[in-house]
């Protein structure tokens, strides 16, 4: 097992044909219609916004990853127009039961020129202690769990 417990890392970038000044990731993310979230990926089932117990903005995302239904409770740690960082202790509902995975989601935009910018979507999923106990109980190796994502 890797010492950092990484299950998966993914970064996707896209060129936006608009000046950086016109991009507001935080506004888009926390006002994203459910239908638009679903159009972003066939794996996306639904999304909505709420607040944490301490009042921080949250987005709840439901999607499938591998053989798991994921309910992600993303709490905003940084919420700026050009950069957002959210952390979720996500519920992973699998054929063998339910467990938890930590997911860090970072979205950013940077200027390319006066007319375009680059959007970046970075996801880093890590095993929690509960997840490690769950896979051990179910006879699944860490490498098998990682490959299932």
Give residue ranges: language-model regions.
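A short, structured loop/turn motif at beta-sheet edges
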Residues: 18-23, 78-83, 108-118
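Short acidic, gly/pro-rich beta-turn/loop elements at beta-sheet edges
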Residues: 24, 69-72, 129-133
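Glycine-rich portal/gate segments that line the openings of hydrophobic small-molecule binding cavities
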Residues: 45-98
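Beta-strand/loop substructures that line and gate deep hydrophobic ligand-binding cavities in soluble
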Residues: 91-149
């Amino acid at each position: 097992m890797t010492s950092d417990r990484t299950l998966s890392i993914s970064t996707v970038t896209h060129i936006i044909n608009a000046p950086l000044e016109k991009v507001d990731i935080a506004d888009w993310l926390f006002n994203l219609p459910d239908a638009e979230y679903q159009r972003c990926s066939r794996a996306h089932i639904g999304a909505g916004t709420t607040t944490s117990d301490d009042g921080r903005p949250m987005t709840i995302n439901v999607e499938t990853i591998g053989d798991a239904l994921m309910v992600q409770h993303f709490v905003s740690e940084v919420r700026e127009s050009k950069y957002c960082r959210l952390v979720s202790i996500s519920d992973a509902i699998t054929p063998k039961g339910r467990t938890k995975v930590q997911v860090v989601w970072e979205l950013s935009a940077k200027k390319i020129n006066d007319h375009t910018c680059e959007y970046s979507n970075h996801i880093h999923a890590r095993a929690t202690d509960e997840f490690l106990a769950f896979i051990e109980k179910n006879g699944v190796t860490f490498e098998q769990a990682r490959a299932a994502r």
